[in-house]
A protein has these predicted regions:
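Flexible, gly/pro- and Lys/Arg-enriched active-site loops
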Residues: 1-152
Length: 152
């Protein structure tokens, strides 16, 4: 999430941070990921080593290597006791906040233009347990921080 709350632009991310992608892979590998259909479309393919649950109202929706779910409850039931990563987009986050207990966030220290913002996020509801700052460099146009938040 950028300093201005932006999380997307043009059905993608408004930044390219290779270390963020590497961390995302490390965190989610071997786990189930819940995403909205637009997020699935923006990724464009199943991510290896991870189970993809796609929340959509379209009963006829189907994609190879993805499981369609119609509700948060169905997604939680399918994930069982395993960790379920809610990876976006904005519409899904807006309804999933009540079930999210831990947030692995990348704060991008920039204010890019965007067309998707993280709605419903209130920092006062969370306690920071981890922060690791990274400066801009040849591979990363913006400074950023990896942050872990747990619900108060």
């Amino acid at each position: 999430m950028a300093d201005n709350g932006v999380i997307g632009r043009g059905n993608g991310l408004p930044w390219h941070l290779p270390d963020d992608l590497k961390r995302f892979k490390a965190l989610t590998m071997g786990h189930a990921m819940l995403m909205g259909r637009k997020t699935w479309d923006s990724i464009g393919r199943p991510l290896p080593g991870r189970r993809s649950l796609v929340l959509t109202r379209s009963a006829g929706w189907h994609a190879p290597a993805a499981e369609r779910v119609a509700s948060l409850e169905e997604a939680a039931a399918r994930a069982g006791a395993a960790t379920l990563f809610v990876i976006g987009g904005a519409e899904l986050f807006s309804i999933a906040w009540p079930i999210i207990g831990r947030l692995e966030l990348t704060e991008v220290h920039a204010a890019p233009e965007g067309d998707v913002w993280l709605a419903g996020f209130d920092r006062a509801d969370w306690r920071e347990t981890f922060r690791e700052r990274h400066d801009a460099d040849a591979r990363h146009a913006h400074p950023f921080s990896f942050v872990t938040l747990v619900r108060r």
